Amino acid sequence: IIKSNLNLSKKTKLVVVPTTAGSGAEVTSNAVIYINKIKYSVESEKLIPDNFFLIAEYVKGLKKSIKSSSGFDAISQSIESLMSLKSTKESIVFAKKSLNFSLTNYLNFYKNPTNLNTSAMCIAANLSGKAINISKTIAPHAVSYPFSVYYNLSHGHAVSLNLEKFLLFNFLNQDKSLASF
């Protein structure tokens, strides 16, 4: 990971409008760059936009493949945030709220998008971004990158290939004293 010791300077305000309902990048300090199929992560508080606007109309008409991939990314980020050793009370609140929005609206957003369920998925993605900005993602995201790079699989779909296996592994190997939520 390339950390913020790059001495980056902000010369202007950054205002963003997400065009998917998935990554929550509008509230995170992380970026990913691929060079020759090698993933480089950049992390700096200076990467967090100064402002953002969640506009359902820009997301509502996306192809179903993009909706399913980005929606699953938000769901996975929330689940991973809950499982992360770096989770905090604040990240857990964000992750649980995100999952509530996601699990209530994902199927309708995918099948019959309305401004209401699309807005809910945009909020879910934003909350998942807030959660992982604190806790970071864990193994399911890390393992997904080769699937995207070498098999041209979308990010959310790549994560979906292995999340279940990690959940099962962690469930079977959990410390029973930690199973409070």
Provide a role label for each language-model segment.
Residues I1, S78-I79, S102-N105, A125-S128, ...:
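Buried hydrophobic packing segments
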Residues N30-S135:
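Carboxylate- and glycine-rich phosphate/diphosphate-binding segment that chelates Mg2+/Mn2+
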Residues F72, L99, P140, V159-S160, ...:
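A general structural signal for well-ordered alpha-helical segments in protein cores
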Residues V149-F181:
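Gly/Pro-rich interdomain helix-loop hinge
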